[in-house]
Regions:
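Short connector loops at secondary-structure junctions
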Residues: 1, 79-80, 142-168
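Non-catalytic alpha/beta scaffold blocks inside enzyme catalytic domains
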Residues: 1-141, 171-287
């Protein structure tokens, strides 16, 4: 039920924007509005947007506007639930605006695609969206295209998934990977005093919040000055800028290699972590 960005550009004849999308993806929406899919029977894509009234919508080329699907000021999750309910022919406490236009477009569609991001959609909204797409696939075809708010963050999630079988917030305290998004929430662990050492890795320098008692901070970041409050600061390079890297690309929906734009002598985060691990553990780390 997922689709690649390239397939969306080529085939999507109905595009449904679910919630607010990060600004880095607004150009994709404009590109979709300015091109014609090869499966369209009317030589034009139909655009809908799901969300409360007043929600910002990426601009479409040619002065076009997306048809709003909303339940007034109801939340995104509630609107998706109502949309799913109406699609099944059941009654709702508040109908979705322009639902008949949406139903007609889906009936004629050959390749509808829902654009979404975890940036503005919480868990229940994403669950309702997946349910709606599953319902549509029982009789026709529909797909979802995930547009991450942060490409580096999503790349890290994919790397965690292929190495452990789970996304981030996975722990190894018992010798094997355990996915627990609540227990392994770093911010919660620090606030609760469960941690006595915080290793922070970030290309952007950020001042830490109020220092917690008994917790030391080791900061790996691109900086020329020590990070305030850190016991140790180690300068690292930025992937794709200071050194060659493999990064996630939303445009292709996959990983790609990139050369350093301004190569420097700053080491990569992976190099520093491996050096730390070589002194902290008797056995070498896996690749």
């Amino acid at each position: 039920m997922t689709v690649a960005p390239g397939e969306t550009r080529r085939r999507a004849d109905v595009v449904v924007i679910v919630g607010e999308l990060p600004r880095i993806h607004h150009s994709l929406v404009g590109e979709l509005a300015g091109t014609v899919p090869d499966l369209s029977t009317v030589n034009q894509r139909a655009f809908f947007v799901v969300g409360p009234n007043g929600m910002s919508v990426p601009p479409l080329n040619g002065g076009r506007e997306a048809t709003r699907l909303s339940c007034g000021q109801a939340s995104l999750a509630a609107t998706l639930a109502a949309l799913r309910t109406q699609y099944k022919g059941r009654r709702t406490s508040q109908p979705v605006s322009n639902f008949n236009d949406f139903a007609k477009a889906l009936a004629a569609a050959r390749f509808p695609v829902f654009l979404f991001s975890g940036h503005a959609a919480e868990g229940l909204a994403l669950e309702m969206l997946q349910g709606l797409i599953a319902d549509l696939n029982r009789n026709s075809r529909a797909s979802g295209l995930h547009l991450p708010a942060n490409e580096n963050g999503w790349g890290s999630t994919l790397a965690s998934a292929w190495m452990t079988g789970f996304p981030l917030r996975t722990g190894f305290a018992r010798g094997f990977p355990e996915f627990d998004p609540w227990r392994c929430d770093v911010a919660r662990m620090i606030a609760a005093g469960e941690a006595d050492l915080h290793l922070r890795i970030s290309a952007a320098t950020a001042q830490p919040k109020e220092k917690k008692r008994r917790m030391a901070l080791i900061a790996l970041t691109k900086t020329q000055e020590p990070v305030a409050g850190a016991a140790v600061t180690i300068a690292i390079g930025e992937a794709g800028l200071d050194h060659d890297a493999v990064v996630y690309s939303s445009r292709t929906g996959s990983l790609r290699s990139t050369e350093a734009q301004a190569a420097s002598q700053l080491p990569s985060a992976a190099t520093i972590i491996r050096l730390i691990a070589s002194h902290a553990f008797a056995e070498p780390l896996p690749c």
